[in-house]
């Protein structure tokens, strides 16, 4: 049965061994349904090797256990930290330990570069690369409950044991095709610590504002900042404090008193009284007092009034053909929104530089300028010089 580490000394000994290896594979189990911050419940780590002691479970809920030895390993620049779909795991370690593990390898991103499709799942990679099938019977486990059953432990550990073979295959494939630098460009976004810092003052930018009124924007900014701060301090999901539609309603109705909140059709019961209600009214007042010159500007989307639908369709055909030829997921090269931008006459974007330009961007611009055309030959689409 998988071994579970429950003491700091044992964790330090394991991490000292792992520090001599070229890489470790890492995964986490956590809960987030009822909290703002994810509750870390289990960490799975494996190093190269077949011995039972090479892959372990770490119980962060064990009394007295410090994860500092693990964080020291995460800071070791000589050991690659391998994850699959790393973003949520990285966010947890940033919040819990104040760091982003580096150097990083994300097998989901690497698989997209290697032609396995868009956002391919771990189970698919296990089946296609490791030629194994995962037992998913423990998928919906409450990982905060103890003790964990043997079946739950086996399920959790499989998330890092097969990951070793997947990493070795994908890293070799990247080296063979000279695409390692493609992956590094993508991973730079994941390892940027700023991506995991939530600034309450910028929380309003996630809202889908339906009004262009500057005053509505100012109030929405203050309401969103209050909601984010309250949710963080109380560690509750932001939508349990104030739902987006209720926030936008208040930004429009501009309640001046707690009693005015009773007129809302959308406010949750707990938001109509007490600290939340008082905070909402105060936020509205702050929004009303923001000078016009300091009201944040809503970033307007690009004007696509000149969008040529036929050209957008041609670009989609070109993208799919070029992606298939290069063995890269289309989503990694350009999004549907990018294609609409190109078809509207915009010639800047991530697709227009670096390896994306080599694979697709340069030919997209040539198509836009009438220098090439698309033709079908049998089952293949090819580019024809005009």
Curated annotation (Swiss-Prot):
Name the record gives this protein: Ribonuclease D
Cofactor(s) in the UniProt record: a divalent metal cation
Substrates-to-products reaction catalysed: Exonucleolytic cleavage that removes extra residues from the 3'-terminus of tRNA to produce 5'-mononucleotides
PROSITE patterns linked to this entry: HRDC (PS50967)
Xref: InterPro entries: 3'-5'_exonuclease_dom, HRDC-like_sf, HRDC_dom, HRDC_dom_sf, RNase_D, RNase_D-like, RNaseH-like_sf, RNaseH_sf
Similarity annotation: Belongs to the RNase D family.
PANTHER family given in the database record: RIBONUCLEASE D
Pfam short name (any one): HRDC
Phylogenetic lineage: Bacteria, Pseudomonadati, Pseudomonadota, Alphaproteobacteria, Rhodobacterales
A GO term from the CC aspect: cytoplasm
Superkingdom per UniProt: Bacteria
Domain 3'-5' exonuclease: 3-174
One function term, GO molecular function aspect: 3'-5' exonuclease activity
Function in brief: Exonuclease involved in the 3' processing of various precursor tRNAs. Initiates hydrolysis at the 3'-terminus of an RNA molecule and releases 5'-mononucleotides.
Residues covered by the HRDC domain: 213-294
Intracellular or extracellular location(s): Cytoplasm
Alphabetized UniProt keyword annotations: Cytoplasm, Exonuclease, Hydrolase, Nuclease, tRNA processing
């Amino acid at each position: 049965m998988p071994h579970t580490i429950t003491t700091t000394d044992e964790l330090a000994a394991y991490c000292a061994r792992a520090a001599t290896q070229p890489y470790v594979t890492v995964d986490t189990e956590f809960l987030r349904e009822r909290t703002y911050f994810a509750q870390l419940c289990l960490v799975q780590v494996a190093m190269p090797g077949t011995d039972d002691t090479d892959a372990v479970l770490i119980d962060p809920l064990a009394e007295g256990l410090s994860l500092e030895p693990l964080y020291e390993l995460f800071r070791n620049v000589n050991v690659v930290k391998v994850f699959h779909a790393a973003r949520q795991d990285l966010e947890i370690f940033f919040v819990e330990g104040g760091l982003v593990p580096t150097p990083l390898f994300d097998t989901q991103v690497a698989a997209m570069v290697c032609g396995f499709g868009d956002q391919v799942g771990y189970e698919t990679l296990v089946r296609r690369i490791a030629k194994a099938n995962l037992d998913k019977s423990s998928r919906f486990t409450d990982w905060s409950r103890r003790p964990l059953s043997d079946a739950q432990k086996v399920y959790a550990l499989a998330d890092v044991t097969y990951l070793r073979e997947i990493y070795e295959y994908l890293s070799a494939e990247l080296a063979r095709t000279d695409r390692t630098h493609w992956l590094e460009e993508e991973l730079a976004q994941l390892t940027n610590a700023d991506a995991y810092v939530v600034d309450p003052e910028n929380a309003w930018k996630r809202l889908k504002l339906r009004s262009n009124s500057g005053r509505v924007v100012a109030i929405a900014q203050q309401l969103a900042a209050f909601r984010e701060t309250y949710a963080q301090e109380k560690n509750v999901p932001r939508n349990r404090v104030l739902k987006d539609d209720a926030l936008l309603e208040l930004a429009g109705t501009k309640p001046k008193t707690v009693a005015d909140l009773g007129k809302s059709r959308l406010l949750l019961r707990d938001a109509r009284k007490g600290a939340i209600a008082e905070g909402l009214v105060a936020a509205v007042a702050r929004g009303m007092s923001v000078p016009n010159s300091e009201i944040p500007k809503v970033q307007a989307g690009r004007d696509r009034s000149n969008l040529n639908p036929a050209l957008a369709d041609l670009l989609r055909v070109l993208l799919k053909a070029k992606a298939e030829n290069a063995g890269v997921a289309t989503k990694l090269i350009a999004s549907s929104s990018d294609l609409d931008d190109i078809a509207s006459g915009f010639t800047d974007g991530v697709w227009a530089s670096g390896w994306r330009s080599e694979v697709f961007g340069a030919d997209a611009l040539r198509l836009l300028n009438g220098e090439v055309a698309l033709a079908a030959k049998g089952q293949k689409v090819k580019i024809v010089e005009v």
